[in-house]
UniProtKB/Swiss-Prot annotation:
It is found in: Cytoplasm. The active site is at D7, E68, D141. Binds 2 Mg(2+) ion per subunit. This is Crossover junction endodeoxyribonuclease RuvC.
Length: 185
C-alpha cells in the first residue's frame, strides 16, 4: 500500500510518501515541505499547497492519503489555516478518487513512539529509526508527515476490520428490523 502523509499547515505543509510491505515494514519514498509566506494572500497560499499536493498525487499515485486531524484548542487562526490546508488536499484527493483518512496527533504519536504524549523530538527520532534514514528529517513538518503515513500503514488493517464489523452489524440490524416488520404483518 502506498500512503501519502500530510502534516497540514499554511506556513509549512509536510508531504510524505511511504510504501508498506509485510508486517510493519515501511519504506520512505519521498518527503518535502511546501512553504508559503505569511504575507501572501490566503487564496494564493492555498493554491500553492493544492498545486504541490496534486503534483504529488499525480506523480506518486498513492492508494490512500493520511492527514492530521486539526483541533481547535490551538490558536484559532492557526487552526483555521491548518484546517483549510488539509481541506484543499482532501478535495484534491476526492477529485482523484483517492481514499482519505484523518488521524489525531495522539494516534500518530502512539503509533510511532508507543506514547500518545510523545514530544516532537521523540517522534522524529522514531521516524528516523523506523525508516532507517541516514539523517533526521527536517523540519518537524517533514517528520510529522512521515509519521502520519507510518501511522496509517500500521493502523489500516484495524480500520478495515472495524469497517467490516460495522457493516456486518448494520446488515444484522437491517435483517432484524425486516423480521420484526414481517411479524407485525
Amino acid at each position: 500500500m502506498r500512503v501519502m502523509g500530510v502534516d497540514p499547515g499554511l506556513t509549512r505543509c509536510g508531504l510524505s510518501m511511504i510504501e508498506s510491505g509485510k508486517g510493519r515494514q515501511v519504506i520512505a519514498l519521498d518527503v518535502d515541505v511546501v512553504r508559503t509566506p505569511a504575507d501572501t494572500p490566503l487564496q494564493k497560499r492555498l493554491l500553492t499547497i493544492s498545486d504541490a499536493a496534486e503534483h504529488w498525487m499525480d506523480t506518486h499515485r498513492p492508494d490512500v492519503i493520511a492527514i492530521e486531524r486539526v483541533f481547535a484548542n490551538q490558536n484559532a487562526n492557526t487552526a483555521m489555516g491548518t484546517a483549510q490546508a488539509g481541506g484543499v488536499i482532501a478535495l484534491a484527493a476526492a477529485k482523484r478518487d483517492i481514499e482519505v483518512h484523518f488521524h489525531t496527533p495522539s494516534e500518530v504519536k502512539a503509533a510511532v513512539t508507543g506514547s500518545g504524549r510523545a514530544d516532537k523530538s521523540q517522534v522524529t527520532e522514531m521516524v528516523t529509526r523506523i525508516l532507517a534514514l541516514q539523517a533526521k528529517p527536517t523540519p518537524a513538518d517533514a517528520a510529522d508527515a512521515l509519521a502520519l503515513a507510518i501511522c496509517h500503514c500500521w493502523r489500516a488493517p484495524m480500520i478495515a476490520r472495524m469497517a467490516a464489523a460495522e457493516a456486518m452489524a448494520e446488515e444484522q440490524r437491517r435483517k432484524f428490523q425486516a423480521k420484526i416488520k414481517a411479524a407485525r404483518g
